[in-house]
Amino acid sequence: MSTGSISDVDEFHESELLDGLPKFGSGKDPGTSNESTEDSSNCEGASVSECTGKRRKSANMRRSAPNGVAQEGKQVQRNAANARERARMRVLSKAFSRLKTTLPWVPPDTKLSKLDTLRLASSYIAHLRQILANDKYENGYIHPVNLTWPFMVAGKPENELKEMLNSTRLCGTTAS
């Protein structure tokens, strides 16, 4: 931040001296000329912000000089990432469709969102846990006869079901 003090002028001169020196790890030796030193000599009459803007532009141009090669590399990476994402989404969609077909009380022609599918699967799992916990078999079937579609076990709302499940955890699992 410029305050107009003498120290600002000193900082400006120090930055000019440092601009002429090679940066650590830049891979350039001090004997080679670069565009930034040429730009700084052209900026003697210009303001500090104009000079730094020109230096930034020339540095960006140097970095992107092999523009075609860099763009091709980026495009290849982008295409590979897109292919991975498409494959991931195919696997996820297939898993959801298998989950929908395993839910016994959902009509096959019913369209369900992913959230609805997960909620129904959760209530079905809760029903199966309840059966295992109570050792109840209704008419000899282990099937969710009392389940109402969607999201209810034996007429209980989902929040009451969560409370019931938290009190009767199986296999030593902990509440999340």
Curated annotation (Swiss-Prot):
A GO molecular-function annotation: DNA-binding transcription repressor activity, RNA polymerase II-specific
Record region (Disordered): 1-84
Main subcellular location: nucleus
Comp. bias regions, Polar residues: 31-44
Gene3D superfamilies hit by this protein: Helix-loop-helix DNA-binding domain (4.10.280.10)
Keywords: Differentiation, DNA-binding, Nucleus, Transcription, Transcription regulation
Domain bHLH: 76-128
Name of this protein: Transcription factor 21
